[in-house]
Swiss-Prot record:
Compositionally biased spans, kind Low complexity: 71-96
Organism annotation: Hirtodrosophila pictiventris (Fruit fly)
Gene responsible for this protein: per
GO cellular component terms given for this protein: nucleus; perinuclear region of cytoplasm
Disordered: annotated segments: 30-124
Localization (cell): Nucleus; Cytoplasm, Perinuclear region
Record note on modification: Phosphorylated with a circadian rhythmicity, probably by the double-time protein (dbt). Phosphorylation could be implicated in the stability of per monomer and in the formation of heterodimer per-tim.
Full protein name: Period circadian protein
Length: 124
């Protein structure tokens, strides 16, 4: 007989394999992962693609809280292509690392972000 201290399997554990099979048998449409999206795309379009990628990816579906699309799942996809942005419109604001709108925190610039490739010489 089983020990009385053993925890019975949860509903989710019992249905895990069945859910996996049903998911992959439905042949979900998955978006390809692009590390370098085409240049000249507005940040709105690339963030929409980011949303679609995290929604459609079978890997993200089983992370975190059962694939409900929590913010924990989304950050893994969005951190892939953060760029270092130099804000030249306002003197004294310097450089800032921005992954979103690229305004460098000043809010005054509406120009597209200037992408600077981070190299060892820039760090020295």
């Amino acid at each position: 007989s089983k020990s009385s201290t053993e925890t019975p399997p949860s509903y989710n554990q019992l249905n895990y394999n069945e859910n996996l099979l049903r998911f992959f048998n439905s042949k979900p449409v998955t978006a390809p992962v692009e590390l370098d999206p085409p240049k000249g795309e507005s940040s709105y379009v690339s963030s929409a693609r980011e949303d679609a990628r995290s929604t459609l990816s079978p890997v993200h579906g089983f992370e975190g809280s059962g694939g409900s699309g929590s913010s924990g799942n989304f950050t893994t996809g969005s951190n892939v292509r953060m760029s270092s942005v130099t804000n030249t419109s306002n003197a004294g604001t310097g450089t800032s690392s921005a992954g979103g709108n690229g305004n460098g925190g000043s809010g005054a610039s509406h120009a597209p972000p200037v992408t600077v490739t981070l190299t060892e010489s820039l760090l020295n």
